[in-house]
Amino acid sequence: MADVINISRIPIFSKQEREFSDLQKGKEINEKILNKESDRFTLYPILYPDVWDFYKKAEASFWTAEEIDLSSDLKDFEKLNENEKHFIKHVLAFFAASDGIVLENLASKFLREVQITEAKKFYSFQIAVENIHSETYSLLIDNYIKDEKERLNLFHAIENIPAVKNKALWAAKWINDTNSFAERIVANACVEGILFSGSFCAIFWFKKQNKLHGLTFSNELISRDEGLHTDFNCLIYSLLDNKLPEQIIQNIVKEAVEVERSFICESLPCDLIGMNSRLMSQYIEFVADRLLECLGCSKIFHSKNPFNWMDLISLQGKTNFFEKRVADYQKSGVMAQRKDQVFCLNTEF
C-alpha cells in the first residue's frame, strides 16, 4: 500500500495569503448578508426566496437513522475480502470524523455569522441533518466491527489513522477566524463537495454489485444531502458583494482535489475494491470542475465523468435532483405549492 501523503504537501498559509485574507476581511465589514438585519424577528415576508427554497428542499428530504435497514449488511460485510473490509472501515471512519468538523463549522461559525434569517433556518436544519449522518456512520461501524478495540480505533480515526488525519487537517484548518468569510465558505463547499466525492463514489460501486444494502442506501441519502449543502454554500457565496479573485478560488479547489486524490487513490486506494484509481482521479477532477462552475469560475481540469452510473447523484450540483423522490424518499407535500394544497371531497374511492 502506498505511503500516506503528508499534509505538508498542502501549503498551510503563506504570508501573502495571510495578507490577502486580512484585506478581504476588511472588505467584508459592510457585507449585507453578514450584517444583522434590523428588528427582523419573524420569518415572513420571505426576503431571500432562493435561500428559503433550499431550506424547503432540505426539509422535504429529512430522514432518520432508524429508517436504514441494516439487517442483511453484516452477512454481506463478512463475505467481503480483507481489502474490501479495510476500505469500508476506513471510509466510514473518515465520514464519522468529518461530520464533527462540519458540525463545528456550522455551529460556531456560519450559523453565527450569516445574518439572513432564511439562511439561519437552513443552517439550523443542516445541523440536525449532520447529526443524523454522524449517527448513521457510527451505527454502521458498530454493526460491522465487533472487536471493541478496533471499533474505538475507528471512532478516533483523526488521532489514529494517518490517511483520515490528513483529510481532516485540511478541512479543520479552515475553521478559524483568521481567514475571510468568502474563503471559508468556498473551502466548506470543497469539504462537502470534493472531500466526500471519492468515498461516496466508491460506496456506489458496492451498490452496483448489489452488496451492503443498508450502507449503500444511507450513502444515497447522505450524498444527496451533501450535494444540497454544497450547492447552498455556492448560493451564499453568490450573495457576497466582495467575491474572491478566480485564481484564489481555483487554488482552494486544487488543494481539495489533491487532498481527496491522495486519500482515495494513494493512501486508501480504491484499487482495493476493484475500482480504477486513474478513473477515480478523473472523477474527482470532474466533480471539482462542476463546483468551480457553481461558484462562477472557469473549469481547470476539463475532465469528463468516467463513471456514467454516477450521473444522477447529487455531487454534480444537480439541485433539481431534490425535486425527485430519490429512492422514493421525500416528505409528502413539503415541496408542493400552497395553491396546489387543496382539500376536496369529490375523490372516488
Swiss-Prot record:
Stretches that traverse the bilayer: none
InterPro entries: Ferritin-like_SF (IPR009078), RNR-like (IPR012348), RNR_small (IPR033909), RNR_small_AS (IPR030475), RNR_small_fam (IPR000358)
One annotated GO molecular function: ribonucleoside-diphosphate reductase activity, thioredoxin disulfide as acceptor
The entry's keywords: Deoxyribonucleotide synthesis, Iron, Metal-binding, Oxidoreductase
Catalytic residues of the enzyme: Y137
EC number: 1.17.4.1
Gene3D superfamilies listed in its UniProt record: Ribonucleotide Reductase, subunit A
Binding site for Fe cation 1: D99, E130, H133
Catalytic activity: a 2'-deoxyribonucleoside 5'-diphosphate + [thioredoxin]-disulfide + H2O = a ribonucleoside 5'-diphosphate + [thioredoxin]-dithiol
Pfam families in the record: Ribonuc_red_sm
Purpose: Provides the precursors necessary for DNA synthesis. Catalyzes the biosynthesis of deoxyribonucleotides from the corresponding ribonucleotides.
Xref: PANTHER family: RIBONUCLEOSIDE-DIPHOSPHATE REDUCTASE SMALL CHAIN, RIBONUCLEOSIDE-DIPHOSPHATE REDUCTASE SUBUNIT M2
Family (UniProt): Belongs to the ribonucleoside diphosphate reductase small chain family.
Subunit structure: Heterodimer of a large and a small subunit.
Protein name in the entry: Ribonucleoside-diphosphate reductase small chain
Organism in which the protein naturally occurs: Plasmodium falciparum (isolate Dd2)
Source lineage: Eukaryota, Sar, Alveolata, Apicomplexa, Aconoidasida
Gene name per UniProt: RNR2
